[in-house]
């Protein structure tokens, strides 16, 4: 059966709606799910889904057949962030936070599966921390890394964990994939992440994801 002819504007609108819907459903969506939710004919949804998958914007799970956001979307997100001076926007908030709680604060982003500090505000008189702008850290053992990964699609989290592995840095480091996945869900529920001597002995750190504020 021939695919129904759609106007360019309709096709673009449906493509954007599919991407937005995929981003809102962490467990993934099937062709039928998209068709039902967005009121799009299954044949049209199937064509758009295959095209997005071919270009890396969606990925299809071979086990359940559901579609989830692909890594290409993450690349676009990174490009969008680079066009905005995140540090400039965050710095006044960070300074206010330091004034309120008198603890050194950091701003970090996710880059190639690592957490990278892009800004730091040191609290006066506070114990100096061995951190610096540009420092790269593991995502499974740091509070900031957990916060960054927790709000990604589960497929993206799994891909990063597979790529990076779960290195044991202290006796408290989580090195079990099921346990770290549960930890990410806990972060999403609580709204903050904790590093309880998992990256470095003697250090207890808390992090909140600014994107969730």
Regions found by a protein language model. Name each.
Residues 90-95, 164-203:
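Short, basic/aromatic recognition patches
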Residues 2-88:
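N-terminal helix-turn-helix
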Residues 63-163:
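Amphipathic alpha-helical effector-binding/dimerization core
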Residues 206-213:
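Conserved small/polar residues in nucleotide/adenosyl-binding loops
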Residues 13, 20, 53, 119-122, ...:
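Acidic-residue sensor for enzyme active/binding pockets
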């Amino acid at each position: 059966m021939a695919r129904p002819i759609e106007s360019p504007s309709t096709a673009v609108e449906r493509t954007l709606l599919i991407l937005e819907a995929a981003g809102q459903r962490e467990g993934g969506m099937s062709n039928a799910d998209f068709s039902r939710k967005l009121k799009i004919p299954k044949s049209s949804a199937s064509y758009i889904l295959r095209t997005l998958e071919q270009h890396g914007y969606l990925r299809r799970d071979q086990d359940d057949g559901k579609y989830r956001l692909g890594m290409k979307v993450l690349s676009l997100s990174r490009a969008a962030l680079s066009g905005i001076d995140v540090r400039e926007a965050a710095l006044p908030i960070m300074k206010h936070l330091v004034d309120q709680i008198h603890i050194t604060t950091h701003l970090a982003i996710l880059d190639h599966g690592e957490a990278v500090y892009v800004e730091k505000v040191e609290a006066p008189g506070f114990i100096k921390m061995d951190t610096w702008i540009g420092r790269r850290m593991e995502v499974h053992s740091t509070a900031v890394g957990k916060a960054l990964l927790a709000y990604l699609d589960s497929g993206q989290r799994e891909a990063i964990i597979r790529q990076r592995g779960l290195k044991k840095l202290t006796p408290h480091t989580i090195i079990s994939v099921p346990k770290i996945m549960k930890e990410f869900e806990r972060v999403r529920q609580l709204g903050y992440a904790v590093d309880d001597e998992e990256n470095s002995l003697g250090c207890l750190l808390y992090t909140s994801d600014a994107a969730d504020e």
